[in-house]
Amino acid sequence: MNTVIITEGISALAESTYIFDLYQTKVKACCGCWSCWLKTPGRCIFNELDTLYYHYINAERIIYLAKVKKGFISSELKAFFDRMLPLYLPYISVKTEECMHVPRYSHYPDVEFYYEEEFETDREREVFENYIKRTFYQFYSKLIVVKPLVACDKVEEVN
C-alpha cells in the first residue's frame, strides 16, 4: 500500500512511506492568485509542495499526525490544507445539496487523521473532529478516520 505521512514534528516509524514534516518544510500560505487554476493548472506558483502533490494523489492512504493548538489545527496545517487547492478544478458542483470543487483526478486517498489532544470539553473535541471530517469530505476522501494520537501505533515525539 502506498502511504504518505504528514506530520508536525512527530516522527513516524513506518516503512514504504513518503513522510512530509510540516516543521521541516515551511509551507507558504496561499496568496489567492489562482495561478494553480488559470496559468499553471494543477501547479502552485510556490513549488515546495510539488513532490508532495505527486505522492499525495498517488497514495492509497494519507496519515496525518497533527498537533492541536487552542482547540484547532495549527497555522502550518491550515496553510497546508489551503494549498491543496491545485488538486481540484476551478469549477463548482452541487453534491448532496452543497457546493464542492470538481475533482481534478479520478482517485483521492483515504485519510487517517490522528491528533494530540488539547480540549477542555467533549463538545470542543466534537467540533474539531467534525471540521476535520468535513475538510476531507470536501477533499473527496472516501474513508476518513479521525482519532486522538494515542490511538495510533508506531509514533514518537521528536525533541
Residue positions per predicted region:
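Short histidine/acidic/glycine/proline-rich micro-motifs that form metal-
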Residues: 68-70, 117-122
